[in-house]
Design a protein with these regions (language model features):
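Short helix-loop-beta connector
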Residues: 104-107
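Short beta-strand immediately N-terminal to the catalytic nucleophile in serine-hydrolase-like folds
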Residues: 110-113, 137
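Cell-envelope and extracellular/periplasmic
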Residues: 19-22, 26-30, 98-101, 116, ...
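The feature captures the conserved acid-bearing segment of alpha/beta-hydrolase catalytic domains
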Residues: 140-203
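A conserved amphipathic alpha-helix that caps or lines the catalytic cleft of carbohydrate-
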Residues: 40-43, 125, 186
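Serine-hydrolase catalytic machinery in alpha/beta-hydrolase-like enzymes
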Residues: 8-11, 15-102
Length: 203
């Protein structure tokens, strides 16, 4: 079902046949691997379109997913702002995937992630036009200065956002901004003419 390979020193998990309608790329850490089968089953149940899935391992989560440096929110580990290098790696991965899996020019690439990877996916949408769709599941839109960054136009045809309905109830002064920020994010995208779905889910 899955193929595990390595590209430029990073572990990549591949799923799906060749010549698909969509290609979803998801940056994750190792803890998400055990949830992969259920994720793909859920995706398959939600659409009749063909898709393939590429999971990219991110060993330094706070460093490689953060768009710019920021102080720690939980614990002592801050954010070093290494997302630019990760973006370059993923952009270079796209032509490799097109060649390796016979993806046509009509195949649409989607970048999606959870938490800080959701923020990274949104940030990438502002920085590069390669991905037609962006998925941010509980994206870390509380990130310092994110509200100012999103005043510019995004390079995406569609954006999906979701948030757990209990996430704003945290006592952390930074994290409690998440609902206000994600609703602001959707409002800005809609004003830019970008179709955007925002869903609140249990949790």
């Amino acid at each position: 079902m899955f193929k595990i390979t390595e590209k430029d020193g990073r572990k990549i998990i591949l799923y799906g046949e060749q010549n698909r309608d969509f290609c979803l790329i998801q940056p994750t850490d190792a803890s998400d691997e055990e949830k992969l089968s259920s994720l793909l089953q859920n995706l398959s149940a939600l659409t009749d379109r063909t898709f393939c899935y590429r999971r990219v391992n991110i060993p330094d989560w706070n460093g490689e997913m953060s768009p710019w440096p920021a102080p720690a929110v939980f614990g002592e580990e801050g954010f070093s702002g290494g997302a630019k290098a990760t973006l370059e790696y993923i952009e270079n991965l796209v032509p490799y995937l097109k060649s390796e899996f016979n993806l046509s020019d009509n195949t649409k690439f989607i970048l999606g992630g959870y938490s800080l990877a959701g923020l990274f996916s949104l940030w990438r949408g502002y920085e590069s036009p390669i991905f037609s769709g962006i998925r941010g599941a509980s994206p870390s839109v509380w990130f310092p200065d994110w509200d100012k960054f999103t005043d510019k136009n995004i390079n995406a045809d569609y954006v999906y956002l979701s948030l757990g309905d209990r996430e704003r109830k945290t006592k952390n002064k930074t994290m409690c901004k998440v609902r206000e920020r994600i609703e602001m994010q959707k409002e800005k995208l809609v004003k830019q003419g970008v179709p955007c779905t925002l869903e609140y889910n249990p949790g």
